[in-house]
Design a protein with these regions (language model features):
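Substrate-binding clefts and catalytic carboxylate motifs of secreted carbohydrate-active enzymes
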Residues: 44-150
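Active-site neighborhood of glycoside hydrolase catalytic domains
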Residues: 1-31, 48, 91
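Alpha-helical scaffolding within the catalytic cores
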Residues: 33-47
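Short alpha-helical segments and helix-capping/turn motifs at coil-helix boundaries
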Residues: 18, 37-40, 91-94
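Intrinsically disordered, low-complexity boundary segments flanking structured domains
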Residues: 17-22, 39, 108-111, 127
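Catalytic metal-binding/acid-base residues of hydrolase active sites
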Residues: 13, 22-23, 37, 57-59, ...
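Structural signal for conserved beta-strand scaffold positions within catalytic alpha/beta enzyme cores
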Residues: 19, 33-34, 53, 124
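Short, flexible loop segments at the rims of nucleotide/cofactor-binding pockets, characterized by
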Residues: 29-34, 85-86
Length: 150
């Protein structure tokens, strides 16, 4: 990992290098990338590099007639309505907001769309339905982004 991260940085110093997304952390690269499901959490810190959450979330919501396989569906946590799933997303986003003051630098929600048997997406597998309340998601995401400018 360290050798590849150093080679990559030397090859193209203009790009950020993420040496290991989610595990096998070494003192190299431009960031420390953690994975935590379902709720976000910073459990490691590095004084030399920003800490990011490369994966979190996994909020499951099954929407009939928009599934890859109707009888096998999975999410880290399962909800029965868009409101419940959106409430959980907002709860996690509030946690991210509170982590900014502790040095938190970025996050990637898993995942943008449902894939095969995973129903964790913000949209359905067929991309026909946005599963969460777009207005509430946009508002909380903008609140987090704006807090990074302070």
């Amino acid at each position: 990992t360290q050798e590849i991260a150093e080679w990559t940085k030397q090859y193209d110093p203009s790009r950020l290098v993420n040496p290991a997304s989610g595990g096998n952390h070494y003192q190299c690269g431009d960031m420390l990338d953690l994975h935590k499901y379902p709720a976000p959490e910073m459990y490691l810190y590095d004084a030399q590099r920003p800490t990011v959450l490369g994966e979190y979330g996994g909020i499951g919501l099954v929407l009939k007639d928009h599934l890859w396989e109707p009888n096998r569906n999975w999410g880290y946590v399962q909800f029965n309505s868009s409101k419940e799933a959106t409430d959980e997303y907002v709860k996690y986003a509030e946690m991210l907001y509170n982590m900014v003051v502790k040095g938190f630098s970025g996050a990637v929600y898993t995942q943008t769309t449902d894939v095969e048997i995973e129903v964790n997406g913000l949209m359905t597998y067929d991309r026909k339905v946005v599963k969460l309340d777009e207005k509430r998601v946009r508002e909380i995401n903008q609140r987090i982004c704006n807090s990074l400018n302070k």
